[in-house]
Swiss-Prot record:
Organism: Pseudomonas aeruginosa (strain ATCC 15692 / DSM 22644 / CIP 104116 / JCM 14847 / LMG 12228 / 1C / PRS 101 / PAO1)
Subunit description: Interacts with the Sec translocase complex via SecD. Specifically interacts with transmembrane segments of nascent integral membrane proteins during membrane integration.
Bias type Polar residues, positions: 37-66
Homology family: Belongs to the OXA1/ALB3/YidC family. Type 1 subfamily.
One GO biological process term: protein insertion into membrane
Its job: Required for the insertion and/or proper folding and/or complex formation of integral membrane proteins into the membrane. Involved in integration of membrane proteins that insert both dependently and independently of the Sec translocase complex, as well as at least some lipoproteins. Aids folding of multispanning membrane proteins.
Keywords: Cell inner membrane, Cell membrane, Chaperone, Membrane, Protein transport, Transmembrane, Transmembrane helix, Transport
Chief place where the protein resides: membrane
Record GO terms (molecular function): membrane insertase activity
InterPro entries reported in the protein's UniProt record: Membr_insert_YidC, Membr_insert_YidC_N, YidC/ALB3/OXA1/COX18, YidC/Oxa/ALB_C, YidC_ALB_C, YidC_periplasmic_sf
Subcellular location: Cell inner membrane
Membrane topology reported for the UniProt record: Multi-pass membrane protein
Protein name (record): Membrane protein insertase YidC
Amino acid sequence: MDIQRSILIVALAVVSYLLVLQWNKDYGQPELPAASASMNTTQGLPDTPSASGTSSDVPTAQSSAAGSEAADKPVAVSDKLIQVKTDVLDLAIDPRGGDIVQLGLLQYPRRLDRPDVPFPLFDNGRERTYLAQSGLTGADGPDASSAGRPLFRSAQSSYQLADGQNELVVDLSFSHDGVNYIKRFTFHRGLKADCSDKEKAQKKIECINENAYQVGVSYLIDNQSGKTWSGNLFAQLKRDGSADPSSTTATGVSTYLGAAVWTPDSPYKKISTKDMDKEQFKESVQGGWVAWLQHYFVTAWVPTKGEQHQVMTRKDGQGNYIVGFTGPTLSVPAGSKVETDLTLYAGPKLQKHLKELSPGLELTVDYGFLWFIAQPIFWLLQHIHSLIGNWGWSIIALTVLIKLAFFPLSAASYRSMARMRAVSPKMQAIKEQHGDDRQKMSQAMMELYKKEKINPLGGCLPILVQMPVFLSLYWVLLESVEMRQAPWLGWITDLSVKDPFFILPIVMGGTMLIQQMLNPTPPDPMQAKVMKLMPIIFTFFFLWFPAGLVLYWVVNNCLSIAQQWYITRKIEAAAKTA
């Protein structure tokens, strides 16, 4: 019995520690600052010299008549940001280089009490630097010019996806030395028209187009000069070292905020900012992706499949962290045209869409070392939600199904506890008989177990077998963006944050107290005191846990109480009639 209790206490302590480290909430995101194009976006580009410097492998750019004549009736020719809006994205493009410097997620409000303020993903203001950069570098690439990055022209200063329109194309043009460039952004409608407003509000995966948060980026190079053009396509994500504004924990430990890449040896390789502080990462990769992760959301560049790219991470002179890639050398003969493209994903961690975009990208939903158990659990939870339409009730239904699946193991555990409870008077007598002689008391206990055919670990091992599944479910509820701002009923308007009135944690503590009353009292006084404190300790921890986690624990405890009460009464009744 001592061994059983000790193992259970250690297991519960480990689970509690892991849960505290994984607990997150989504308050405190800063407002999107006013648009500003004055920030320096050249710093950190691959093989890019400074504006005042020169580079031995990049010729000095000089304007030409051919370049000026190729301009196609520009309207916006300034450093003013180009605004683009779809039904799911609200973003700004800096004409200086054509970088996406601001991006808000319209379907994911910053807070429930501010539904009109979208969650800010990209930002290049005074408080935070986080942007998606792409361009052409190399021998003739305009982004490698000593004069600085190219200033693109656009036909409009703002673009918006119209009703009934499924695709929005934004072209930026630039001409230099007889070469005409078009940087084309392609945006897509995010929500399906055949879904109701209620289904869209529930963010059902069936109502979200798979390319909703994908931005197609392509370069059209029209070489009208008298020589062959040569350059390389690059893309990168640049972020400063500030904390994730959407994720903090009760202990001050943030969830993973950093880079990740796909490599042939690892479909999901995390590269933290600490790793970038120590050394650069470089590897030649065919296809794959590079990404920057934060709680619930991810941004990723996905190059053309089949092409060889140089993936790298580094830290620039301004303290920004960069993850990106450079593509193979492009060669455009005089009088020819070439197009090269890639895809940017910027949005929530929707596993189905991420997996379809590029293999391994769905692993950015980081379920920890038990991901192989967590992913099937999430798959089942998502299918239940497609039928029920409420994540709170879906959690309850999933808890019931898991409890049914482990019913035989749980029943074995409770039967063992019931037998221990039945012989507890004999155990107490042994304790009183041998007093402080622990060796004799242990020998007498083992003889009692053997005589009564009781396995002291019989009630513990079944619980330990189930623990990986329970822990995986916790991580599913913690890391899945579907839980963010998802209501259940009544006062629970967001399953991803704490219960505002602490009702569920108090109920959870009550269920733990009832469970304790059904279990036999430990013979060791110290263990008995520790077990009595467990409901209080857990209630305190769970006061700040996401309501979805506490809901799972409450339902699981209630089912366990019912099962244990039934089995215990059945065994006691059989003992009386024997």
